[in-house]
Amino acid sequence: MSKRFCVTGTCIPAKNYMVDISGRVDMIIHDYIDKGQYFTINRARQYGKTTTLYMLEQRLKSDYLVISLSFEAVDEYFASLGTLAEGLMMDIAECLKNQNASEIIIEEWNEPLSDKFPLRSLGMKITKLCKASNKKVVLMIDEVDKSSDNQIFLSFLGLLREKYLKCQQGKDITFQSVILAGVYDVKSLKLKIHPQEETKYNSPWNIAVDFSMDMSFNINDIKSMLEDYEREHNTGMDIGQISSIIYDYTSGYPYLVSRICQLTDERIASYEKDADEKKAWTKTGLLQAIKLLLKEPNTLFDDMTKKLLDYPALKDMLQKILFDGIDFPFKRENPIIDLGVTFGFLKDRNGIVAVANRIFETQLYDTFLSEMAVNDKLYIDAASNRNQYIASDMLQMDLVMKKFYEYFEEIYTENDHKFIEENGRKLFLLYLKPIINGTGNYYVEARTRDNRRTDIIVDYKGKRFIIELKIWHGNEYNLRGQKQLFDYLDYYKEDRGYLLSFNFNKNKQTGVNELEYDGKKILEVVV
């Protein structure tokens, strides 16, 4: 049976095309497990945590007794200390059987717990197990934060902490290493020790060391997966180029990398009209796959939408970054920034808060714009007249820009400067989106965005259009903007670009102008 790309559950090397993470697994074993460290792998949703634990288990089994658990769908365990102890005892017994532990060890483990002190009794069982085993014992728990707000779970963490500290003092024998995996960092749980007590940061998991390994995929990681695919399919793809494009859009977010590859393989190369495997694994094919990804419902984007509803301050920060070009200093001590990083939405770019990747940026732009579009006249006009912007099956960007000038003058010319300065870029994106929707892609260049400048890159059926949006205060600033755009065209090897200037000078001259410099042309629209 041939392999497939996998985006749900655990990736299995024999069944799935996947990044070779053996180097990371070896490093975790050497730097953490062999050294007896307790740690938490806390990363965003669908970031490869479960697959990493699976690969760790496979590598560890020859040298360690591995107890691998998951708190997914075990809510009933947390009804009381007794049910938690019984549930863990049952699950660990199953692990011992699967690891071919001796009958004596299994029989001792299955002896009844104390009714009065179930958790203390479980702790004594752990000591007996670790003494009796001829291998050191490693405990791994996935989806650990599914019950992390539960006081009973915290009592279990307290038990592990107590046993760890006693072991350090030579007074107990316990697990060699404990690995907890989830989205949230269990070390920073907010606890209420008593119902009336104020909320505190007081996690019993402060014995854990920091797990700082980068679990995102770099270009070479992506290459390793595509090389595996190419050995079976012989598409003739340029693996280096394809890996770079995927990385440019995903910044190595594991789910996004695998999903783009999966859509390219299973939709673009197999089921789309005029499907051709060789054509699919090109830049054009990848952009089609990215377009499908941004249109489809999936658990990652659903979770993003939910988090934006649950955390309005995070949503407000994202809007200020995307639409206003505001630079926020990156400090994870700020709880909003910390949440954004925890969810995988934000990252540190040279000390400034940035959206984690281009796919997330576009998804967030689309989400925010869709909220505005319902009653927006500019969006409705652009959507209803979309066909006029397409000729010979190609987007006519000159006409798009000229019509925006007409619509803007008609609809928004009487609005005050503050409204235009705060919303001008949103209005243009609202206008552009329905015109290219369904056929073209767009993204905003994060490297050049600030509170006065936004560069938009549109890909339409293989043709690229570069549009620079400027807030214009003074002629010198505008001339500098024109020079920047000419340089940008040179970087992208394009001969024509577009400049949209929102001019707030008293004696401004609005209109459409043609500019030329060093063989390159710019269509400038001033509103």
What are these regions (language model features)?
Residues 1-47, 51-59, 128-129, 410:
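Walker A/P-loop-proximal flanking segment of P-loop NTPase domains
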Residues 9-10, 148-249, 263, 267-297:
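The catalytic "switch" region of P-loop NTPases
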Residues 40, 61-77, 139:
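Conserved catalytic segments around the Walker B and adjacent sensor/switch elements
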Residues 66-67, 79-103:
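Conserved NTP-binding/hydrolysis module of P-loop NTPases
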Residues 91-141, 145-161, 165-177:
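Mid-core helix/loop region of P-loop NTP-binding domains shared across ATPases and GTPases
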Residues 218-343, 349-350, 377-387:
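Winged-helix-like regulatory helical subdomains adjacent to P-loop NTPase cores
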Residues 431-462:
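Active-site metal-binding core of divalent-cation-utilizing nuclease and nuclease-like domains
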Residues 478-482, 489-518:
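Nucleic-acid nuclease catalytic cores
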